[in-house]
A protein has these predicted regions:
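Hydrophobic faces of well-ordered beta-strands that scaffold small-molecule active sites
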Residues: 78-81, 102-104, 132, 250-256, ...
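Bateman/CBS regulatory modules and CBS-like beta-alpha motifs in cytosolic regions of diverse proteins
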Residues: 60-74, 81-83, 112-150, 157-159, ...
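Alpha/beta catalytic cores of nucleotide-metabolism and tRNA/nucleoside-modifying enzymes
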Residues: 30-54, 135, 195, 255, ...
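Catalytic cores of alpha/beta
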Residues: 91-92, 264-265, 269, 312-325, ...
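Glycine-rich phosphate-binding active-site loops on the catalytic face of alpha/beta enzymes
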Residues: 102-109, 277, 281-285, 329-343, ...
Length: 523
């Protein structure tokens, strides 16, 4: 017991003494509480910098190829998000041509999503083994509609037995004013053909010799078995970095949820030759998501399945044990996501990536870092923390190929961008992503995202060039010649808030924006 002499002490001093004692006692209890409850300190991209190392690697020499899933390699470690203002067929085609892969969102009918996957798969083919065809009874209007739907310039004409009878191209229809005219009256019948043994070089020589753009492949009976086009040969030579399957088709993934029609959607996407299925939810460490994952793998054991999103080591191990071919990391880091504020959950993205990557190290299951990427420097930080690729939404929402509406605001061009947890997106089909699919009353939806606008950025190719340029530069500083070495050797130093300020341009007024930097992203 402590005895205190109060002689000569005012009542105010006595009260102050007891208040101080109470505060110290409360602080002691709080520290005990925090010790029990706080697991660790979470870090994100702005909290760290990578430490440069001795290097013999030039940026132009690095290899950016990485794994998207267990069995799908991408040549650029960049994935476009499954968002209805980001990835549809046009952007999926563009990003695959740049070496990455797009995940077509599911806020559309099953038929429309499958059709978009088909468009991507048909956008480029070294040899098209299932070309779009038209029969002898078709009209000019039907041919035009097919060309418009699939964005193609020519269609082989076959009879009921599949025998090639001719070909109709956009040149044949360019000045045709009678849409009901039979296709047999306008098609070309004197055709140059080849067989399935023709290689790419031989096909190119035949096309050049006869000055034609399309070379049908037929079997011994005259049945159409494929098509080679000059345009696809040219694209193959012009874009050697494109992400393609073993048949020379661009790769694409499709998103599914946990709704009642999920397996129907999965079947349609697989029939459309999708390369991977992405189970798209806000929290994948749940019974419902795991059950869907198991059902997909049970019915389609060869299909590659991405499962997400998660942020903990326990979740990662569980999904890998249940058959996931890739895991997607991120709860709440996105620019249009409010999950951390509304639900109060999440882990800062850098720590989340490290948690997951460390937990499944050696499993052969790649990690996709989804969200929080604002600068190209964040990409290299994400990979050094353990990710195999990054997924982005806001970085691509402003490109020409994104499906978002174009907006003119204060004389500048913007594009609409919204979170899949926004009210509007949830109304159109993403409710199950946030486990609210049984709720029909809009007033009872609890959104976890917002609607926004982002500056128009030009073409996706221009954005990817700057993103990968920054990644290459960073790998050069670290002496990492490929992604594997970057993941293994990358080391961080933690920085203070003053260090963050010092890292950005300071003490000047920016007079001209750089194509890869915006102060607004920092603020």
């Amino acid at each position: 017991m402590v005895f205190i002499s109060l002689k000569g002490t005012s009542i105010y001093e006595i009260c102050f003494f007891f208040v101080i004692c109470a505060i110290k006692n409360l602080k002691s209890h709080l520290m005990s509480f925090l010790k029990d409850k706080i697991l660790y300190e979470g870090l994100t991209f702005d909290d760290v910098l990578l430490v440069p190392a001795y290097s013999e690697v030039l940026p132009r020499e690095v290899d950016l190829s990485s794994m998207f899933t267990r069995n799908i390699r991408i040549n650029t470690p960049v994935v476009s998000a499954a968002m209805d203002s980001v990835t549809e067929d046009e952007l999926a085609i563009a990003i695959s041509r740049e070496g990455g892969i797009g995940v077509i969102h599911k806020n559309m009918s099953i038929e429309k999503q499958a059709s978009q996957v088909k468009r991507v798969k048909r956008a480029e083919n070294v040899m098209i083994f299932d070309p779009i065809t038209i029969n002898l009874e078709a009209t000019v209007a039907e041919a035009m509609n097919l060309m418009s739907e699939y964005k193609i310039g020519g269609i082989p004409v076959i009879d009921n037995n599949g025998i090639l009878k001719g070909i109709v191209t956009n040149r044949d229809l360019r000045f045709e004013n009678n849409p009901s005219r039979k296709i047999t009256e306008v098609m070309t019948t004197n055709l140059i053909t080849t067989n399935h043994q023709t290689n790419l070089e031989s096909a190119a020589r035949i096309l050049q010799k006869h000055k034609i753009e399309k070379l049908p492949m037929i079997d011994e009976s005259g049945k159409l078995i494929g098509l080679i086009t000059y345009k696809d040969i040219t694209k193959t030579k012009d874009r050697p970095n494109s992400c393609k399957d073993d048949k020379g088709r661009l790769r694409v993934a499709g998103a599914v949820g946990i709704a009642a029609d999920t397996m129907e959607r999965v079947e349609a996407l697989i029939n459309a030759n999708v390369d991977a299925i992405s189970i798209d939810t806000s929290h994948a460490h749940t019974k419902s998501v795991i059950n869907i994952l198991k059902e997909i793998k049970r019915n389609y054991p060869k299909v590659e399945v991405v499962a997400g999103n998660i942020v903990t080591s326990e979740a990662a191990k569980k999904l890998v044990d249940e058959g996931a071919d890739a895991v997607k990391v991120g709860i709440g880091p996105g620019s249009i996501c409010t999950t951390r504020i509304i639900a109060g959950v999440g882990i800062p993205q850098l720590s989340a990536i490290y948690n997951v990557a460390k937990a499944i190290e050696g499993s052969g299951v790649p990690v996709i870092a989804d969200g929080g990427i604002r600068y190209s420097g964040d990409i290299i930080k994400a990979i050094a923390a353990g990710a195999d690729s990054i997924m982005a939404g806001s970085l691509f929402a402003g490109v020409e190929e994104s499906p978002g509406d174009t907006i003119i605001y204060n004389g500048r061009k913007f594009k609409a961008y919204r979170g899949m947890g926004s009210i509007e997106a949830m109304q159109q089909g993403s409710k199950d992503r946030y486990f609210q699919d049984i709720e029909d009353d809009i007033k009872k939806l609890v959104p976890e995202g917002i609607e926004a606008r982002v500056p128009y950025k030009g073409t996706l190719a221009e954005v990817i060039y700057q993103m990968t340029g920054g990644l290459r530069a960073g790998m050069g500083y670290l002496g990492a010649k490929n992604i594997t070495i970057l993941k293994k050797e990358g080391k961080f130093v933690r920085i203070t808030h003053s260090g963050i300020i010092e890292s950005h341009p300071h003490d000047v007024s920016i007079t001209r924006e750089a194509p890869n930097y915006s102060r607004k992203s920092f603020e």
